[in-house]
């Protein structure tokens, strides 16, 4: 099992940040450096400098890399917004192929698709330009990623799926269908951006996915500061340890001031690195 953190490339020059990272963590998720807008800012013109920097740091310190993320409705480059239908679909699959091929053999697990299910009680797919290319786009992405990098574990990643609810059940049904039909999916990521309470069926939910024959991973953990914060970090860790196929936990940053929700002081280290 691993314990990881999300890392932006520019923080690798911050000695306090890297000191904690290299001492306490053994896996890295690039925060933004492998997203579509970063890696293919213009169509068919790929840019990997920042992502490569993160991979190099990980390799130098014996850390795993979770690739994040090949296809997502957000943080798309402007040119993608002008495409639709089969033109967009082919650009999507070309992007998956090119990026996964560039990092072939260097990525422990890829978030192939991120956040493709709707919030609320429908359990349905989120409407997006990706979804409008046809409901089979997720399957196509996983098959394309497997062809490009057969050794990487291929994950589906989402948020608000931390307990058993309509959204997590929608994801569950997709994963079950994929496993039944032999679509290559190896893991499911649970972002776990949490408030002050943990769903009481958190571990049960992880286990039901594991029972489908996939690994489960906590991928973007952060927890609102308060009297329950330490207890919740412990509870999430214990839940993962109790599920044999829960292969690791990643916190979404290192120090509170690194966090996208820094006002919540949600991470394990404070802004002074303590």
Indicate residue ranges for each PLM-predicted region.
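Acidic-and-aromatic substrate-binding clefts and catalytic sites of carbohydrate-active enzymes
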Residues: 6-18, 36-49, 76, 117-121, ...
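Short, flexible, mixed-charge acidic loops at enzyme active sites
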Residues: 20, 71-73, 261-265
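Structural recognition of alpha->loop->beta junctions
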Residues: 21-27, 86-88, 94, 98-108, ...
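Substrate-binding cleft and catalytic face of glycoside hydrolase catalytic domains
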Residues: 23-43, 47-162, 208, 225
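Glycoside hydrolase catalytic-domain groove-lining segments
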Residues: 49, 53-64, 132-157, 164-247, ...
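Aromatic/acidic polysaccharide-binding cleft in carbohydrate-active enzymes
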Residues: 243, 247-273
């Amino acid at each position: 099992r691993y314990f990881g953190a999300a890392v932006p490339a520019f923080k690798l020059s911050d000695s306090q940040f890297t000191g904690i990272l290299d001492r306490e963590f053994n896996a890295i998720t690039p925060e933004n450096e492998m997203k579509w807008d970063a890696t293919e800012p213009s169509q068919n013109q790929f840019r990997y400098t920042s992502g490569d920097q993160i991979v190099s740091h990980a390799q130098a310190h014996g850390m795993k890399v979770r690739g994040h993320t090949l296809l997502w409705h957000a943080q798309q480059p402007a040119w993608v917004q002008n495409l639709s239908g089969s033109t967009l679909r082919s650009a999507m699959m070309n992007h998956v192929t090119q990026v996964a091929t560039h990092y072939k053999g260097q990525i422990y697990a890829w978030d192939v698709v991120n956040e493709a299910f709707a919030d609320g009680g429908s359990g349905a797919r989120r409407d997006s330009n990706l979804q409008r290319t046809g409901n089979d786009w997720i399957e196509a992405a996983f098959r394309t990623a497997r062809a490009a990098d057969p050794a990487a574990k291929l994950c589906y990643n989402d948020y608000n799926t931390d307990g058993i609810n309509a959204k997590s059940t929608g994801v569950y049904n997709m994963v079950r269908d994929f496993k039944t039909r032999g679509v290559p999916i190896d893991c499911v990521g649970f972002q776990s951006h949490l408030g002050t309470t943990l769903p009481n069926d958190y571990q049960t939910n992880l286990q039901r996915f594991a029972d489908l024959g996939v690994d489960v991973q906590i991928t973007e953990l952060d927890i609102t500061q308060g009297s329950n914060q330490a207890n919740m970090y412990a509870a999430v860790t214990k839940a993962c340890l109790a599920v044999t196929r829960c292969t690791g936990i990643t916190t979404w940053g290192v120090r509170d001031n690194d966090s996208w929700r820094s006002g919540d002081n949600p991470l394990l280290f404070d802004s002074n690195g303590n």
